[in-house]
Amino acid sequence: LDVVPAVQANWTSDPFTAEIRNDRIYGRGAIDDKGPAVAVLYALRAIKAAGIPLRKNVRFLLGCNEENGSTDLAYYLAHAAMPPQVFTPDGSYPIIHLEKGMLRLEFTKQTADPIVRFSAGTAPNAVPADASVSLSAAFCGTAEQGSQITCLGNKLAYKGVAAHASTPESGDNAITGLLTYLGSDAAFADCKALAQLFPHGCTDGSGLGIACADTESGALTCICSMLHVENGMLTGCVDI
């Protein structure tokens, strides 16, 4: 339920086995969105106990693929009718009456950049905290290395800060950080091009020329959330 994919190597315990340490529960999705789900059950129980008559039926739906495209919802709609009214109890107060539209894009390209393997991101709707790359040639970039970059032989890694795609400004995108660094070497033309489309620290889509904002919903958010290179094929994901 509302569980983002987990990279086992980034955990000191099994992410899918809840573990309590120092009065805190550790596990992937331990909070999201368990409290509100339980609150709905208690609310329905309270209505029933109080004998409050309902003019309409109430159906409680729990989906377990929300973080990866809600394919379970498609199955549900193929077997049951869409409810006339739906609300999701996962927001804050005051009541949220507006939600941004969402667009996810995937792109692929055969790259000539001297990259053996590039790996970053596990979920399309999250700012990745880690990015790593293995190179097939010596790196001759001019960018300042900075504390986020570590180098070990022909392997480079960037340590950023994870964040939800809806609030990317609170994170540090490891993909764009590493792309910016690699792009300072003329041999990494595709990395440089991507760094221009997704400037490090920019989250409003300015690099793509799509930045916009309004009073109610605020600024558009745009992140490169996943990027991988295998056998010369570059694949990426953009969350808008």
Give residue ranges: language-model regions.
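Acidic/His- and Gly-rich active-site-bordering loop/insert found
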Residues: 1-28, 49-54
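Short helix-loop-beta-strand segments that form the rim/entrance of peptidase-like active sites
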Residues: 47-66
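Short glycine/serine/threonine-rich phosphate/pyrophosphate-binding segments
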Residues: 36-37, 69-72
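Midchain, well-structured core segments that form catalytic/ion-binding scaffolds
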Residues: 67, 74-75, 79-240
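Short glycine/serine- and small hydrophobic-enriched flexible loop segments
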Residues: 42-49, 179-184
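Active-site alpha-helical elements of protease catalytic centers
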Residues: 29-44
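Structural motif
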Residues: 23-24, 58-59, 84-87
